[in-house]
Design a protein with these regions (language model features):
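Conserved active-site-adjacent core of cysteine acyl-enzyme catalytic domains
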Residues: 1-150
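Polybasic/polar functional segments that serve as interface/processing modules
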Residues: 12, 155-157
Length: 157
């Protein structure tokens, strides 16, 4: 499990940039939150996954989006930004010594939950610095692929 430092915000629309700040900090890149909010084009409805990919790359990460199921994700050994409940971004930090999934949520801070509960809320899209191992079947490589994958999940983009 990675010890991602939680960042909490009072504005719900800032969840994407806040998660990106946590991920960047994990890779020793500090960027001011207000800068990320501006660069992600955060508006009244927040930002998009495409914004997270673009801004992460702007700050040196090899950001990629993948459609992977919860079982694949919880077995990864590094943090990722995940699309949560089809409306929110949180950071997946890994599993603890008891097998609980550890998340850093911009609205709640760090918390743990069972893998079963995680599966109920995880929206099957995750954002990584580089490729997760093993590589999931679906690499959402282009903006069109990303929009198509989210469309299949019932998310308007």
């Amino acid at each position: 499990m990675y010890d991602v430092i939680p960042v909490v915000t009072e504005r719900a629309v800032d969840c994407g940039p806040v998660c990106l700040k946590m991920l960047l900090a994990n890779y020793d890149t500090e960027v001011d939150l207000e800068t990320l909010i501006t660069e992600c084009n955060t508006r009244i409805v927040g930002c998009t996954g495409k914004d997270i990919l673009r801004v992460g790359r702007l700050h040196g990460l090899d950001m990629k989006a993948f459609q992977m199921d919860a079982e694949e994700l919880v077995n990864q050994d590094r943090p990722a930004i995940v699309w949560w409940m089809f409306k929110h971004f949180v950071v997946f930090c890994g599993k603890d010594e008891n097998g609980q999934v550890v998340l850093c949520d911009p609205a709640r801070g760090r918390y743990r939950m069972s893998p079963g509960l995680f599966k109920q809320y995880y929206s099957n899209v995750s954002f990584w610095n580089g490729d997760p191992e093993p590589l999931p079947v679906e690499d959402i490589a282009t903006a069109a692929d990303y929009e198509h994958a989210l469309g299949e999940l019932g998310v308007e983009v």
